[in-house]
Amino acid sequence: MSDNFTESKNKIWHRRQLLQLGFSGAFMITTGTMWQMLNSKNYASVKIPPMKITASNGATNPMQVLRDFDYGTIKQENGRTVREFRLIAGTSTIQLNSAVSYNIWDLNGRIPGPTLRAKEGEKIRILFLNNAGHSHSLHFHGVHPAEMDGIKPIGNGKATIYEFDAEPYGVHLYHCHVAPVTRHVAKGLYGMFIIDPPKPRPPADEIVLIMSGYDVNDDNRNEYYAFNGVPHHYMHHPIQIYQNQLIRAYVLNIIEFDPAVTFHLHANFFDVYPSGMTMTPSVKTDVLTMGVAERHILEFAFKYPGKYMFHPHQDAIAESGCMGQFEVIAMKQT
């Protein structure tokens, strides 16, 4: 990393300057990153059903979002591990159903944005380029200096660098913080940020579930809702998991315009790790109330094969797109 790049973390960069430093579209996230954790020694015992990648629905593919963790690029600087991520805000169109399309802002061409993942204590560097036509920023939940809080707007065609230590461990999020924040978040500028604890959690099939809403007619009321970007996707394309295998779900509620929703799992109960900041669960339940930006780790395993629904227990929200199914399948004996 060149000195001028390292020392410029508080500056706003123009697109040409970032391109000169290697900030090009070539870094776009690939599905290969999703297997980095599962292929590690600690996760060797975890079996994942063959993934059925469905056709992309505009700006996102919920099946790829489900198990896709972006671990960034690891570097060593002055004896410290630096984990570098690159995010580009852009514009695209998502198909909410066969008749309704919606213009959104996206991050790295997808909604929700990439699920960033690091380990507690690492130094995090976020290279952010705004190509979305309006001023935007990235605000990360967690602990960091004020100048890294992502409040300052970054103009269209410009970029900036956020640097901070990964702390504390848990399930966090990032989102645009330019007013009106509700609109910028609701139109797609958000993602999950996982900081793993120093001691790894037990092996599990890990999935990401982000609840969101769409106000398509600007009346401050959502007409559509979704898990991982696309309404009803996991109802039409159930999430396959193996019978009796531990599932670790990182669940985030980012639904704007609704004060709170619940997460409900059919025919089962889950252990709750509040904000992912504990190593032992606080409660076991089958329905959990979550305010906007609230997130938790939920762990469970299914005893019986079959298809089981999950959804908010505000049924109007569920029936407007925020529902899905787990398809529990027996693991073949080898």
Question: What are the residue ranges of the model-derived segments?
Answer:
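Short, glycine/small-residue-enriched coil/turn segments at secondary-structure junctions
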Residues: 76-77, 111-124, 234-246
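Low-complexity, Pro/Ser/Thr- and charge-rich linker/hinge segments at domain boundaries
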Residues: 194-211, 330-334
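Acidic-aromatic/histidine active-site loop/patch
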Residues: 208-243
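Histidine- and aromatic-enriched segments that form or immediately flank copper-ligand environments
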Residues: 84-193, 258-290, 311-326
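C-terminal segment of N-terminal export signals and the immediately downstream linker at the start
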Residues: 11, 32-82, 334
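N-terminal secretory signal peptides
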Residues: 1-17, 21-32
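Short amphipathic
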Residues: 83-90, 205-211
